[in-house]
Design a protein with these regions (language model features):
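Rossmann-fold NAD(P)-binding glycine/threonine-rich loop
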Residues: 10-87, 231-289
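N-terminal Rossmann-like NAD(P) cofactor-binding module of classical short-chain dehydrogenase/reductase
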Residues: 1-4, 237
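Residues immediately C-terminal
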Residues: 5, 9
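Rossmann-like dinucleotide-binding domain for NAD(H)/NADP(H)
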Residues: 64-67, 113, 120
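Conserved anion/nucleotide-ligand pocket segment
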Residues: 91-94, 101-108, 117-120
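NAD(P)-dependent Rossmann-like dehydrogenase/reductase catalytic/cofactor-binding core
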Residues: 93-100, 112, 123, 128-390
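Rossmann-like dinucleotide-binding cores of NAD(P)H-dependent redox enzymes
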Residues: 72-77, 102-110
C-alpha cells in the first residue's frame, strides 16, 4: 500500500513516473517521493487522486539518520500525512511535518551555514581551516561548513543552493557563491574527487591557535561590564554585535578587540587596525589565561559564529512565520537532520531575540544588502522580550 520513489532529481522524470504509478497502483496506495527539494504539488499535478501523493524525505545515511520530513503538497490529504507519520514512527524514525516549499525545512534553514562560510572565504577573512574550526570547535557544530560541503560534494551542495535561490525568485539570502561555482566548474567536487576546498589526497593538519603570549601583563585590572563587554586595563574586549572592531575603536576612542561567541574551547577574535600591538596582545593573553585556544581573523562584522547562527535563526523564524512547519518540528528537524547543537528557535530564545535583531540590523547597515534583513517575526519576538524585561 506504499510506494517510495527515489528517481533522479528532475521534475519531468518524477511527473512521468508518478503518472504511470497512478495508473497501475490501486487507489488506496500511497505514492511518496524521497525528493529533497522538488515541489510535491508539481509532482502530483497530473496524478489521479493527488491527495495520496506526499514527500518522504529521508536523510543520508538513511539506515542511521532518524529524521524523515513528511511533506504535504497542495492536494495531500491530512489522513495521508497522519498515516505516513505513524508508519515512519513504527520504523524507528522521527517524522516532522512540513508543507511543500523550496528546500522543505532542513535544506532551507541550513543554507546560511554554507553561504556565510563562502562569504567569509570570498572576503578573505580567514583560511578555510580557520573558518571550519571556529564553527566546529567554537560553536559545537559537528563539522565545519566548508569541510561539510566537501563531504556532501560541491556539485550537489551548489545545485541545492541554486535550486532554492531560483525557487525563491533570486532571494538574496540564498545567493550562490562564485567561489563554490569555480570549484564545481573545475571538477574539484570534494572528497569524492580528491580535491575540493581541501586536498583530500593528503593528511590534513590540525588547526593551531595563536602562539602563547609570553609577555606577562599581570596584574591586569579586569572588569566585566554588561552586554558582553570586558574591560582589560585600557582595552575593551567586546563580544560582537555586528560592528567591526575598527568602527567601535574609533567611536569609543579605546583599543578594541572583538570576540566571537565564546561557547567552546576555541575562540575567534578580530582587532581594530588602530590598536597598539600591545593592546591586542593583552586581550589574547587574557583569553589564553582562561584556557582558550585563540584564532585571529580579519576585522569582520558579526564574526563567524554569531553571524552564521543569527542567519540560521532568522531563516527558521521566516519558515515558522510562513507556516512551513511548527516550531517544534523545525527545531527537531535541524537537530536530527544536520545534528545542530540546538534547534534554531530554542537557540534564539537562549541567545536573546534583541541581540540577534541588533546584530542583523548592524550587518544590514554595514553591507547595505537585503540579505541580512531581519524577518518580522524576529522583530515581534524582540519587542516582546524587551517588554518582559522592562
Amino acid at each position: 500500500n506504499l510506494v517510495i520513489e527515489a528517481a533522479s532529481e528532475r521534475l519531468e522524470v518524477k511527473k512521468a513516473l508518478f503518472a504511470q504509478l497512478a495508473e497501475v497502483c490501486p487507489p488506496q496506495t500511497l505514492l511518496t517521493t524521497n525528493t529533497s527539494s522538488i515541489s510535491i504539488t508539481a509532482i502530483a499535478a497530473e496524478v489521479k487522486n493527488p491527495e495520496r501523493v506526499a514527500g518522504l524525505h529521508f536523510f543520508n545515511p538513511a539506515p542511521v539518520m532518524k529524521l524523515v520530513e513528511v511533506v504535504s503538497g497542495l492536494a495531500t490529504a491530512a489522513e495521508v500525512v497522519e498515516q505516513l507519520c505513524e508508519l515512519t514512527l513504527s520504523w524507528g524514525k522521527q517524522p516532522v511535518r512540513c508543507h511543500s516549499t523550496p528546500g522543505f525545512i532542513v535544506n532551507r534553514v541550513a543554507r546560511p551555514y554554507y553561504s556565510e562560510a563562502w562569504r567569509a572565504l570570498e572576503e578573505q577573512v580567514a583560511a578555510p581551516e580557520v573558518i571550519d574550526a571556529a564553527l566546529r570547535d567554537g560553536a559545537g557544530f559537528p563539522m565545519g561548513p566548508l569541510e561539510l560541503t566537501d563531504l556532501i560534494g560541491q556539485d550537489v551542495n551548489f545545485a541545492v543552493t541554486c535550486s532554492v535561490f531560483n525557487a525563491f525568485w533570486q532571494e538574496r539570502r540564498f545567493l550562490p557563491s562564485l567561489v563554490q561555482q569555480e570549484l564545481v566548474i573545475g571538477g574539484r567536487l570534494g572528497k569524492k574527487s580528491g580535491l575540493g576546498v581541501y586536498d583530500w589526497r593528503a593528511e590534513r593538519e590540525a588547526v593551531v591557535g595563536l602562539e602563547a603570549v609570553s609577555d606577562s601583563f599581570s596584574p591586569m585590572k579586569v572588569e566585566k561590564k554588561s552586554d558582553g563587554v570586558t574591560e582589560i586595563d585600557d582595552v575593551l574586549l567586546i563580544e560582537t554585535q555586528g560592528e567591526t572592531a575598527q568602527a567601535l575603536a574609533i567611536r569609543l576612542a579605546r583599543p578594541v578587540v572583538v570576540v566571537d561567541k565564546m561557547a567552546g574551547k576555541v575562540v575567534t577574535i578580530a582587532a581594530a587596525a588602530v590598536n597598539p600591538d600591545s593592546a591586542t596582545r593583552k586581550a589574547i593573553y587574557y583569553l589564553q589565561q582562561q584556557g582558550k585556544t585563540v584564532l585571529q581573523i580579519a576585522d569582520y562584522p558579526g564574526m563567524l559564529i554569531w553571524r552564521t547562527v543569527a542567519m540560521i535563526i532568522n531563516e527558521a523564524l521566516d519558515a515558522l512565520q510562513k507556516g512551513v512547519a511548527s516550531e517544534q518540528d523545525i527545531d527537531t528537524a535541524m537537530r536530527l537532520g544536520v545534528n545542530y547543537p540546538y534547534g534554531p528557535l530554542a537557540w534564539g530564545a537562549q541567545l536573546g531575540w534583541q541581540r540577534i535583531l541588533r546584530l542583523l540590523e548592524n550587518l544590514q547597515h554595514h553591507y547595505g544588502e537585503e540579505r541580512y534583513r531581519p524577518c518580522s517575526l524576529l522583530r515581534q519576538r524582540a519587542l516582546l522580550e524587551s517588554g518582559y524585561e522592562s
